[in-house]
Amino acid sequence: MFDFKAQLKILPNEPGVYLMKNSLGEIIYVGKAKILKNRVRQYFQNSKNHSEKVKAMVKNVAEFEYIVTDSEMEALILECNLIKKYSPKYNISLKDDKFYPFIKVTTNEDFPRVFITRNYAKDGNKYFGPYPNAGDVHETINLIRKIFPLRTCKKSIIEGEKPTRACLNYHIKKCNAPCEGRISKTEYKKMIDEIMEVLSGKDRSLLNKLKEEMQSASGNLEFEKAASLRDKMIAIENIAEKQKVFKSQENDEDFINIYKDEKDCCIQVFFLRDGKITGREHFMIENSSHEEDTTIISQFIISFYGGTPKVPKNIYIPESDEIEALEEFLSIKRGSRVFVKVPIKGEKKEMLELVKNNAKVTLDQFKDKILRDKEINMISLKEIQELLELDSIPLRIEAYDISNIQGVDSVGSMIVFENGKAKNSDYRRFRIKTVKSANDYDSMREILDRRFTHGLKEIEEIQNKEIKFSSGKFSNFPDLIMMDGGKGQVNIALEVLEKLGIDIPVCGLVKDDYHATRGIIYNNNELIINRNSNLMQMIRRIQDEVHRFAITYHRSLRDKRTLHSILDDIPNIGQKRRMSLLMKFGSIDNIKKATLDELLETESIDTKAANSVLEYFRNTK
């Protein structure tokens, strides 16, 4: 038994993070404190000033732990990391956490690649960005690839090593084929240097050079070359124009503000570069009204700027009691001093008010849409409750489907709709194990039996406290099961449930001659549904989703089988050689056409293995 009185007495007078746990040992809240002793004790003393959510949380606390940190900044960072890791019930969830895209140049490779990434790492490569507008960065990459014939493959290409066959990009003049040794490392580097000059905003010297080349070509009557150089200059100017917006300057400023209603909040960020608003972002945080603005903003700043080294010099916020800790964290990220400021009056204060007003508008729009969607979804769920005469509204619906081609790679899928919305985290896939032929009924019997048997086992383990409720993947049973098939599949489901002693209503979908759903089969009766009703719209969403999920899984299994099964049958070709052949030739058809010499050029393929490949395809023609 946890001794609260004793543990509260020994809390340290130091900064740190505390973790509240329920009777199942689950972490339900994570918080930080400048002084752990003072902060944690507040929860278990006078509760008059506590919000309803805090009161509810404290009622569920069975024990607590704490971690002492060296500084307030460390506590701030650790709190955010633990919230992300455990997603505690009573913490706000920054679900819209996002990292902006960078352009990465892999300068640590002999023949560097240039591509978009959202993962910044100190790996010796060159990064440009971040770009708040993803559309702009994609346009920039497209322009770069249009004027510079760069490689886009992930091959490890080292100058002087054995060349490999070039891909299609070389033949359509989009790559200079360093893999075949058609361009030297030095020549390729010149191209990369030009790209990095443009991305760094140092485009003027390159444009002057291209202008001279264009005039020379024109003077020599090489009009096609001159036109090509002109197009290249225009593209570079377009890229350079975009880069000006994202180039980090000493006067870069971000303005962050928050607007809350009785339940949710919206954080809005305005990006100012050279005194102009160059972009903005919003982040919706549901069920967060109980948290103080300062707490939400601090957690947001740690999360938002945690994934990028490109932190502005000045960040303006409405209020904070953790400015020193935030400045320390942000300065480390930037590599130079960052100032977090709370303006009292003047232009900066007015800008923060503008940001807050925009946050309010965004939240209102968001709530309007959410309310409309919730209202429509609830109408649909009430319609199906009335249609099937259910005791309660089916807030959780599970739908099942089988996918196969002539009995091969049979797979089952389970999708979940909660409150009329898809809940992707609860989707499950089943690879059929016991059914060898194309038998949808037996396949459906197998996946339903596996799903609910596993669910019953988890429920027992939860009751015995062997696992936590949140760890159960199948323990949450539906209020309604929806079979994509008709009466036959419904009967299979009822048979499985009866065998397991589970009472859940099951309905099936009735199709017309064009395979479009026209109604529901329930208790052996066909119930027609108005094709324009909210209920029919929801059923179609469920049906489309279960089809998509099943077919996607089936396709991935089929592609793996098609790609590897033929090579699996060739003597002397193991996994390593199989991968080498596929890496070199790209497809089974190309391997079939390969000569002995071409096969011997492949890594790890000796004469014996090459002859085995030739012999196999000769005998299977």
Swiss-Prot record:
Keywords: Cytoplasm, DNA damage, DNA excision, DNA repair, Excision nuclease, SOS response. Residues 13-92 form the GIY-YIG domain. Residues 204-239 form the UVR domain. It is found in: Cytoplasm. GO terms for cellular component: cytoplasm; excinuclease repair complex. One of its GO terms (biological process) is nucleotide-excision repair. GO terms for molecular function: DNA binding; excinuclease ABC activity. The keyword DNA damage applies. InterPro entries: DisA/LigA_HHH (IPR041663), GIY-YIG_endonuc (IPR000305), GIY-YIG_endonuc_sf (IPR035901), GIY-YIG_UvrC_Cho (IPR047296), RuvA_2-like (IPR010994), UVR_dom (IPR001943), UVR_dom_sf (IPR036876), UvrABC_protein_C (IPR050066). The keyword Ribosomal protein does not apply. Coiled coil: none annotated. Belongs to the UvrC family. The UvrABC repair system catalyzes the recognition and processing of DNA lesions. UvrC both incises the 5' and 3' sides of the lesion. The N-terminal half is responsible for the 3' incision and the C-terminal half is responsible for the 5' incision. Interacts with UvrB in an incision complex. This is UvrABC system protein C. It comes from Clostridium beijerinckii (strain ATCC 51743 / NCIMB 8052). The gene is uvrC.
